[in-house]
């Protein structure tokens, strides 16, 4: 019975994960960039999958720009330095603009909006917004990591007579540090993906490089969307 309960709990986590629109979008993103890596920009089945998945993902993002607009007008966390607040708000504004413009890209790619030249221009503007938002996100994570490192050193001094790795507060800060470091890596790699999509350095950042970086960041995003596990309850025999 305990095995059945454990299986049910695991399946429940899978259902919870797949019910999240953001998680499904990131799975599709992994397929998109995986196909781009395989195709390397050459015509064929992989490129067709890349293009169709790219278009399908835009439906997931309709009106998603409202999320970052809400973040833009929300008050910052108490005690956050002004520099990090401004970078965070810039990230929200740029990402919201990217997602807003992406709706017009979808209209153009589906043929509803007929002006191809203007659609291509909107694509580039939106990608520049995404690249800039990724730069801001990376700088925010760097700043937060610096603040976190400082607070961890202070806490370590306070706990010098005990094992700091057994302290819940210190373990929580270590977990936050790992999460922010992963977010920093993702933001840096997203900048490379944006450069590849904009073809700013086509000789160095080829479609295959873009696909590889995009696939890795997609896996990171999928991991970040995983639901937290409830602590295991020991059952007496």
UniProtKB/Swiss-Prot annotation:
Protein induction: By abscisic acid, H(2)O(2) and nitrogen deprivation. Down-regulated by salt stress.
Cytoplasmic side: 1-92, 224-237
Spans through the membrane: 93-113, 205-223
GO biological process terms held by the UniProt record: peroxisome fission; regulation of peroxisome size
InterPro entries the record matches: PEX11
Gene Ontology molecular function: any one: identical protein binding
Pfam families, alphabetized: PEX11
GO CC annotations, alphabetized: peroxisomal membrane
Compartments where located: Peroxisome membrane
Membrane topology: Multi-pass membrane protein
This protein's UniProt keywords: Membrane, Peroxisome, Peroxisome biogenesis, Transmembrane, Transmembrane helix
The UniProt record lists the keyword Transmembrane: yes
Superkingdom of origin organism: Eukaryota
Tissue specificity remark: Expressed in seedlings, leaf sheaths, flag leaf, panicles and spikelets.
Record topology, Lumenal segments: 114-204
Primary role: Involved in peroxisomal proliferation.
Family: Belongs to the peroxin-11 family.
Name the UniProt record assigns to this protein: Peroxisomal membrane protein 11-1
Lineage: Eukaryota, Viridiplantae, Streptophyta, Embryophyta, Tracheophyta
């Amino acid at each position: 019975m305990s095995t059945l309960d454990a299986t049910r709990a695991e399946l429940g986590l899978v259902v919870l994960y797949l019910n999240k629109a953001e998680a499904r979008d990131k799975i599709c993103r992994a397929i998109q960039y995986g196909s781009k890596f395989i195709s390397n920009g050459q015509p064929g089945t992989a490129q067709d999958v890349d293009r169709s998945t790219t278009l399908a993902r835009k439906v997931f993002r309709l009106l998603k720009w409202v999320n970052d607009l809400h973040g833009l007008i929300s008050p910052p966390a108490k005690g956050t330095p002004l520099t990090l607040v401004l970078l965070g708000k810039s990230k929200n504004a740029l990402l919201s603009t990217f997602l807003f413009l992406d709706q017009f890209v979808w209209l153009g790619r589906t043929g509803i909006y007929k002006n191809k030249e203007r659609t291509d221009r909107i694509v580039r503007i939106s990608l520049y917004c995404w690249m800039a938002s990724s730069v801001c996100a990376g700088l925010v994570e760097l700043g937060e990591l610096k603040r976190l490192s400082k607070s961890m050193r202070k806490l370590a001094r306070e706990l010098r007579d005990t094992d700091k790795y057994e302290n819940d507060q210190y373990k929580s800060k270590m977990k936050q540090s790992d999460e922010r470091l992963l977010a920093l890596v993702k933001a840096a790699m997203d900048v490379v993906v944006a450069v590849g999509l904009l073809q700013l350095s086509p000789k160095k950042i080829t479609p295959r490089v873009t696909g590889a970086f995009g696939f890795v960041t997609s896996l990171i995003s999928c991991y970040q969307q995983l639901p937290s596990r409830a602590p295991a309850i020991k059952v007496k025999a």
